[in-house]
Design a protein with these regions (language model features):
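Conserved small/polar residues in nucleotide/adenosyl-binding loops
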Residues: 363-370
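Active-site cofactor/cluster-binding pocket
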Residues: 1-257
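Thiamine diphosphate
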Residues: 12-100, 269-362
Length: 370
């Protein structure tokens, strides 16, 4: 008889989903995060998109990821090292393993670890675990692609659509690891794909298959996890991003100051969400203008400041360079101006989907140019 599986009781745990762009890691991570928040955990998430427009499948530069930090108490960051890593292909394992703790549980899709996949991911041999120094006992090696194809063989779906359901198998397995109620996952899927009932049925079936796989092979899993939950106080809850929180903060600041809020902005990733969110709240005294370029966005905000509004312009690194002339105009005119810089990787045009804190030195000197 197999010994009972160890259950790790943790105050907080970090889970990282990773795979190709298009493997649905963002959706799987979002669902798991929502379920965890619903049962009473505090969460902080970090989506990671490849900077390439369309990287080759299975390549190192095309790895997409989603990290969630789950806690019994307050959680303030997405976490650093992960306790559980889901790697849907060899490139994901190669790129993300350095984020793992020494005793992390690693889930892989063995169907995506063929010789060709390993060469694409810059492995020098077929012994990828040995090459990276990974303890095989910490790895849940599952033929996810094969099992999803078998699960949906009679669904009438084409092969491409079937492969898009692999993320749900991984999600089901992770839900088993954390003893999450699948009913919450199913409810999410029914709402998400309400207009596509066939897709709802297929995804539910695959999630259940992943969960059952965990039950059936639990002896090969080093341990499962338990994070204490708390009973939520009844009220209104929402998923909130940094950009949305910034938008709400600006609205609140304008209200407290007794001023109208004006945002003059030019769309630029990853700051555009602030413009999108504020545009929804014209009834709260918010005026937004999508300008023709970065300089115009800043100049329009300066005009609004002169007229007595709480004036804001939003941008990212490349836009700061372009706005510098207008920013100095605000300085010499002694007009208050809020500039939101949602930083991305640089230099020059930079990496729209990556984060970096490298604009600060430039920003400290912008007002000294005049």
């Amino acid at each position: 008889m197999d010994a009972p599986i160890e259950v790790k009781n943790l105050d907080h745990v970090v889970v990282h989903f990773s795979g190709d762009s298009g493997d649905g890691m963002q959706l799987a991570g979002n669902i798991f995060s929502t379920v965890s928040a619903t049962v009473g955990n505090d969460i902080s998430t970090f989506p990671d998109y490849p900077a390439d427009i369309r990287a080759p499948q299975g390549s190192l530069t095309g790895v997409s990821g989603f990290q969630v930090h789950i806690g019994a108490g307050k959680v303030y960051t997405p976490g650093d090292k992960c306790d559980v890593l889901v790697a849907m292909n060899a490139a994901a394992l190669k790129m993300q393993y350095h984020h793992c703790k020494p005793q992390s549980t690693i889930i892989i899709d063995t169907d995506s670890f063929g010789s060709r996949d390993l060469r694409k991911a810059d492995f020098s041999s077929d012994d990828y675990l040995g090459e990276m120094g990974i303890d095989p006992d910490r790895v849940v090696a599952c033929p996810i692609t094969t099992m999803v194809k078998d699960c949906l063989a009679d669904s009438g779906m084409d092969n491409k659509s079937i492969l898009k359901c692999r993320n749900m198998f991984a999600l089901g397995l992770v839900c088993w690891l954390f003893n999450r109620e699948l009913a919450l996952v199913f409810d999410f899927l029914r709402k998400k794909f309400a207009k596509k009932p066939n897709l709802v049925d297929a995804n539910i079936k695959v999630v259940q298959a992943g969960y059952n796989y965990g039950n059936n092979v639990h002896a090969s899993v080093p341990n499962t996890y338990r994070v204490e939950t708390t009973e939520k106080v009844p009220g209104r809850y929402m998923d909130i991003t940094g950009n949305k929180a910034t938008a709400y903060g600006l609205i609140a600041a304008a209200e407290k100051a007794g001023l109208r809020l004006f945002l003059g902005s030019y769309p630029i990733t990853p700051a555009t969400d602030i413009l999108h969110e504020l545009t929804k709240h014209k009834s709260l005294g918010v005026t937004t203008v999508q300008c023709e370029d970065e300089i115009a966005g800043c100049a329009s905000a300066i005009g609004a400041a002169f007229a007595g509004a709480l004036a804001v312009t939003s941008t990212s690194g490349p836009g700061i360079c372009l706005k510098s002339e207008a920013m100095n105009l605000a300085v010499i005119d002694e007009l208050p101006l809020v500039i939101v810089d949602v930083q991305r990787g640089g230099p020059s045009t930079g990496l729209p989907t990556k984060s970096e804190q490298t604009d600060r030195s430039e920003e400290r000197r912008v007002g000294k140019e005049c």
